Amino acid sequence: MSALLKFALGVDWISERFGRIAATAVLLAALISAGNAFLRYGLDISSNAWLEIQWYLFAVCVMFGAPEVLRLNEHVRVDIFYGKLSSKGRVWVDLLGILLFLLPAMGVLLYYSWPLFLNMYRTGEMSSNAGGLIRWPAALMLPLGFLMVSLQGVSEAIKRVGWLTHTYDMDIHYERPLQ
């Protein structure tokens, strides 16, 4: 189990770095958006490339932020009975949710997003907008993000099994959201 826990903590470290990149992308997207608005409405200058950079950065925000959100246990969850369960019950729900829903869904998404990226990369697909950018960098964010969410899911499953077997101590405090 110790080798698996080392793997899980290594994945956590990578996810944290991805989260930092996502946070930086949010700032860059906001600055570029403000700059685009100023140039467009203040100086009557527009650039499709700069507009498209914004959605590239949005892809980074979402796809690189997702594994970090999962690591921090801050993801959206449908709380019907979760908050009423014991700590052990919540850990079991998390573990089963990861194994039965998260990992299979990420597998399907990886299966379909990888060929999409490869096709865009091989053909050099460009934006249809004048002055637009190549599309494969944004498409690459999909399989990369799904892969990282998958790895983070495996990490979370390992840590929960570790908690259940008393070989890993984790904070399982759950704060029910305001309703």
Functional labels for PLM-detected ranges:
Residues 1-179:
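Alpha-helical transmembrane segments and membrane-interface helix-loop junctions
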